[in-house]
Amino acid sequence: MKDLATIMVFVLTVGTSVVGYAQNKKANNIDDSEIALQGYSPVSYLELGLAQRGSKQHKSTYEGISYYFTSAEQKAIFEKNPRKYMPQYGGFCAFGIYAGAKFRIDPNKFVVDNGKYYLFLNDLEVDAKQLWMAENDKAKLKRTADTNWKKLSK
């Protein structure tokens, strides 16, 4: 009976971890490396308005996802209030979320607006940042994206 209880605890623990990981991947734009923002520093986006690649020497983990920073100072800033530095829409392309789909981003294509940052897809066919910026009704754009994100992040 004790062995059965041990097995049940193990199965529940592993099952919970797998479900948590799957939910994290669905709501956050990460690959199998589990590194957010393709290694770019979330603090650089918000505090400096720059896309800067971080370093694994300055790594912090928040909710099971690793974030890289350019310095120990940036890492300390992040660790004081990590939620502040989370990208909108889990780091997926903001215009894609507006359109109802999740797309990986080009970490150099971003917009900082009202204390938040939005990341965008950029490829040969689509410059999603340009499409986002061309929209006159930003409030409608964000409302629609917010509504779509509630469905897409589940």
Predicted regions and their residues:
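Bacterial Sec-dependent N-terminal signal peptides
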Residues: 1-25
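Residue-identity detector for threonine
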Residues: 6, 13-16, 61, 70, ...
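Intrinsically disordered, low-complexity terminal tails and linkers in eukaryotic proteins, enriched
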Residues: 21-63, 84-154
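Mature extracytoplasmic domains of secretory-pathway proteins
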Residues: 69-70, 74-87, 91
